[in-house]
């Protein structure tokens, strides 16, 4: 009874939010529903085969790829509704998850993005069939706290779900530690471009030694497991000699790793590997990320990065033939107000490309670029920064609120 009341209240709140022009209303609907019935997430998850996706970077992309791959199992129902419940907007905390499940109540499958800190209690509520563990590294310094504490919390949370299949990235030391003792693990070599936060063993505190792609702890029986899935430049290798083509619309080595884990998750639920890989390859844009827009006659591609590991990966995606690169950094609360992480990022030299430091913290960024030996100019407003670049292709790399605000300005026509 309380659950039905919560759902009706959520529907009314969402409608009112849309009417008032305050977005799609899903978050406010989820918040109100949980206030009325805190057990609603558990109720909505019953009867669904659910995949949870978590990690510091790549959650939204991998969730979108997983949803596409799971769609090959069920298609749509007679009313044309998706067979997979998932978030469209990356809202990965309780209210957003409830909103996604509410919007797809009849779906037999779910691909749910979950914030790392929320994974244990979300798993307790939804009893997932599969959990995808992507990577674990420092996020904003003033948000997530000590990374080894997070690893221990996730390890304890997963121990409560021995029947769940963990799709774990064996190239990430901290993720491996989370899954190492679990009885049902599928290991994927998805890559790890960031090892700064895993130089010591999370179990013994002793050093981690790297020998090529293999790693091991000097102080405990803890080493890189042998992967069942491995991603290549254009192929995906799986169990029993399986090798299938992997052609992605999204750029970068990290996205190939994301696709590998998404495919492995879908296969764990019975999907055909080749069909799952083809479906994952159709994902092109996630909440504005990777999209290309025209701004003042310049073809502008939008990239988002939120922490040192994400910045390092995004910088590797920059097209060296671009005529301009705008790097926009804000320092608002959602970004993390401590920008000392800028000094952990290895900024490249972009010969022949005009680099522009932008955003509310453009001056801090400019200092870092100067010490990195990157020639640049400073134009605080991101739209003006794009306009300052020579005509042609411009790459924009921005942190969370800078990316959000620039997208909003583009949607309102400020850059037309």
State where each predicted segment sits.
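ATP-dependent carboxylate-amine ligase
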Residues: 1-30, 46, 267-272, 278-416
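Phosphate-binding loop of NTP-binding sites
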Residues: 2-187
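Buried hydrophobic packing segments
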Residues: 66, 70, 97-101, 259-269, ...
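Short, acidic/turn-prone active-site loops that include or flank metal/cofactor-
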Residues: 89-92, 135-139, 190-194, 330-332, ...
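Short, surface-exposed amphipathic charged segments that create phosphate/polyanion-binding patches used
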Residues: 101, 147-148, 197-208, 387-395
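Short hydrophobic/aromatic-enriched beta-strand-loop microsegments
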Residues: 110, 130-136, 184-191, 325-327, ...
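Residue-level signal for inorganic ion chemistry
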Residues: 134, 167, 204, 258, ...
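Adenine nucleotide phosphate-binding catalytic loops in nucleotide-utilizing enzymes
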Residues: 184-308
């Amino acid at each position: 009874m309380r659950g039905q009341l919560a759902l009706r209240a959520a529907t009314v709140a969402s409608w009112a939010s849309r009417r008032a022009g305050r977005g799609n209303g899903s978050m406010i609907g989820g918040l109100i529903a949980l206030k009325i019935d805190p057990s609603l997430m558990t109720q909505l998850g019953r009867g669904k085969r659910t995949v949870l996706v978590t990690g510091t970077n790549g959650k939204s992309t991998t969730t979108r790829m997983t949803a596409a791959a799971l769609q090959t199992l069920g298609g749509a129902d007679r009313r044309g509704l998706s067979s997979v419940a998932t978030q469209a907007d990356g809202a990965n905390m309780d209210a957003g998850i409830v909103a996604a499940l509410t919007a797809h109540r009849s779906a037999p499958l779910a691909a749910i993005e979950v914030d790392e800190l929320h994974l244990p209690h979300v798993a307790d509520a939804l009893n997932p069939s599969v959990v995808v563990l992507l990577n674990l590294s420092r996020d904003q310094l003033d948000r997530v706290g000590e990374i080894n504490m997070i690893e221990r919390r996730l390890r304890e949370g997963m121990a409560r779900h021995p029947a769940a299949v963990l799709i774990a990235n064996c190239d990430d030391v901290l993720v491996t530690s989370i899954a190492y003792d679990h009885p049902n693990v599928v290991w994927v070599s998805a890559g790890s471009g960031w090892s700064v936060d895993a130089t010591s063993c999370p179990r013994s505190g002793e050093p981690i030694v790297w020998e090529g792609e293999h790693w091991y702890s000097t102080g405990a029986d803890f080493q890189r497991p042998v992967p069942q899935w491995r991603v290549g430049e254009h192929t995906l290798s799986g169990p029993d000699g399986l090798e299938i083509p992997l052609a992605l619309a999204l750029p970068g080595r990290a996205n190939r790793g994301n696709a590998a884990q998404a495919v492995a998750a879908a296969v764990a639920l019975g999907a055909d590997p080749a069909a799952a890989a083809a479906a994952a390859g159709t994902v092109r844009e996630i909440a504005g990320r990777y999209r290309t827009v025209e701004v003042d006659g310049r073809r502008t591609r939008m990239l988002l990065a939120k922490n040192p590991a994400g910045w390092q990966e995004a910088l590797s995606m920059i097209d060296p033939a671009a005529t301009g690169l705008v790097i926009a950094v804000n320092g608002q609360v959602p970004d993390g107000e401590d920008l000392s992480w800028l000094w952990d990022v290895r900024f490249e030299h972009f010969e022949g490309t005009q680099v522009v430091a932008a955003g509310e913290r453009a001056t801090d960024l400019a200092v870092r670029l100067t010490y990195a030996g990157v020639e640049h100019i400073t134009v605080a407003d991101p739209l003006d920064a794009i306009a300052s670049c020579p005509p042609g292709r411009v790459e924009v790399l921005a942190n969370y609120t800078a990316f959000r605000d620039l997208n909003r300005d583009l949607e309102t026509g400020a850059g037309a």
